[in-house]
Design a protein with these regions (language model features):
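Non-heme Fe(II)/2-oxoglutarate
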Residues: 1-78, 97, 123, 199-212, ...
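Catalytic core of non-heme Fe(II) oxygenases with the double-stranded beta-helix
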Residues: 89-162, 189-201
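Short proline/glycine-enriched turn/loop segments at secondary-structure junctions
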Residues: 7, 99-100, 172-176
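Catalytic core of Fe(II)/2-oxoglutarate
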Residues: 143-222
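Residue-level preference for beta-strand/loop junctions
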Residues: 79-81, 104-106, 163, 179
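Short edge beta-strand segments in beta-sheet-rich domains
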Residues: 14, 82, 121, 178-182
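A short glycine-rich, His/Asp/Glu-containing loop-to-beta-strand
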Residues: 81-89
Length: 222
């Protein structure tokens, strides 16, 4: 008879990864192409939403970090790329924060902190995606990872935070005396994934497809 032991199963958890980058990224401190935190949802095209294309070595460092957890933690044998990426600035005081939001058209998202931060720099706060699945409001005597409806992380230099893009998050009020800088990014799968009628191949949309079927050459407009 197998040994019987009580277990805790963190089923269907939304994992947030707190990683550190062993790479000199001080060049980002000289880049002034910021998007203000409060304006990230502005509906306008901006080449600065692909800022990591200006830093291909750094882009690959972040991508390697994500690929490692995708393969080792989630057992995903897929290719990924960084789609959008942008520098953010959050000013001190009133208005120095962003509203809760999440990222569409993205699988995972990330934030990298490349500056030295004050103790009261605005934290990144994550909200539970299960908010509307609970009918009771019961307040615990001590909050922890198992009972919290939100969780905060304070920025640290060289810290990379990766999380599912569906997680609502925000920058809390920045109470420091100097601007708070970060680099945000989104990850998407590329290549072929899915199955049957839910199959997607991103090559279909880039012109990387087979030649026209000769059977179709006889079709003509009626």
């Amino acid at each position: 008879m197998p040994e019987q032991q009580d277990r805790f199963l963190p089923l269907f958890a939304s994992h947030v990864f707190q990683l550190y980058v062993d790479y000199d990224t001080d060049a980002l401190l000289q880049d002034k192409r910021w998007i203000f935190s409060a304006n990230q949802d502005m509906k306008r095209p901006d080449e600065n939403y692909r800022i990591l294309e200006k830093y291909p070595i750094l882009r690959d460092v972040f991508l390697d970090k994500f690929n490692k957890l995708a393969k080792e933690f989630y057992a995903l044998d897929h290719e990924f790329m960084i789609s959008t990426s942008w520098l953010t600035i959050t000013e001190p005081g009133e208005g120095g924060q962003s509203q809760h939001h999440f990222h569409k058209n993205s699988f995972f998202s990330g934030v990298y902190y490349y500056d030295d931060y004050e103790e009261d720099a605005g934290e990144i706060e994550f909200m539970t995606p299960l908010e509307y699945h609970s009918d009771f409001y019961l307040e615990p005597v001590d909050y922890n990872l198992n009972n919290s409806s939100s969780w905060r992380l304070s920025p640290q230099k060289n810290m990379l935070v990766l999380f599912p893009s569906y997680l609502k998050h925000k920058v809390n009020e920045h109470k420091g005396t100097k601007p708070r800088y970060s680099l945000a990014m989104n990850f998407i799968p590329v290549g072929e994934y899915g199955t049957s009628d839910s199959t997607v191949n991103t090559g279909w949309y880039s012109g990387d497809t087979d030649k026209e079927d000769p059977l179709l050459q006889g079709f003509r407009k009626i």
